[in-house]
Amino acid sequence: MDKAIYPGTFDPITRGHEDLVRRASGLFREVVVAVAASSGKKPFFTQEERVAMVRQVLTDYPNVKVMPFSGLLMEFAQQQQARVIVRGLRAVSDFEYEFQMAGMNRTLYPDVETLFLTPSEQYMFISATIVREIALFGGNIEKFVHPLISTQLGMKIASKDKSSR
């Protein structure tokens, strides 16, 4: 297959995200990891920080490109001339939301398909929200994220702690 987009906020990128990128990179000639500006959420890291972290973590994948985006995903997909959106499903609750989004996206742009991938078993329970929560309470997150991310998350928490004093 040709080109796919794997969108997300990646706040931060987790081992589960990495797993899906690894698998998608084996299916497609090119995978664009699209780091969303995140209109609905207040991200912990800025979009620029998230793009930089994702690039650092995914350096071993020559057919993976990391790009920021804002606005409609389907418009970004058309700009990138991608025909597939890759989405991860961890649980039934993910499926319901993703199924609705895939249907809406197909209505907007019928030429773009959505491909659902489930993470490998050891990553099914990982979410960026849970990883941040564990880190905020001083827990060890090294099993869930790349060492670079663990370090950067620790530094970000420390800087937020200093600024809130």
From Swiss-Prot:
ATP binds at residues 9-10, 17, 88-90, 98, 123-129. Its EC number is 2.7.7.3. The record marks 17 as: Transition state stabilizer. Its main location: cytoplasm. CDD domains: PPAT. InterPro entries: Cyt_trans-like (IPR004821), PPAT (IPR001980), Rossmann-like_a/b/a_fold (IPR014729). It is an enzyme of class 2 (transferase). Pathway: Cofactor biosynthesis; coenzyme A biosynthesis; CoA from (R)-pantothenate: step 4/5. It comes from the Bacteria. Substrate binds at residues 9, 41, 73, 87. It is found in: Cytoplasm. GO terms for biological process: coenzyme A biosynthetic process. Pfam families: CTP_transf_like. The keyword Phosphoprotein does not apply. Reversibly transfers an adenylyl group from ATP to 4'-phosphopantetheine, yielding dephospho-CoA (dPCoA) and pyrophosphate. Homohexamer. PANTHER family: PHOSPHOPANTETHEINE ADENYLYLTRANSFERASE (PTHR21342:SF1). This is Phosphopantetheine adenylyltransferase. It comes from Nitrosospira multiformis (strain ATCC 25196 / NCIMB 11849 / C 71). The lineage of its organism: Bacteria, Pseudomonadati, Pseudomonadota, Betaproteobacteria, Nitrosomonadales. The gene is coaD.
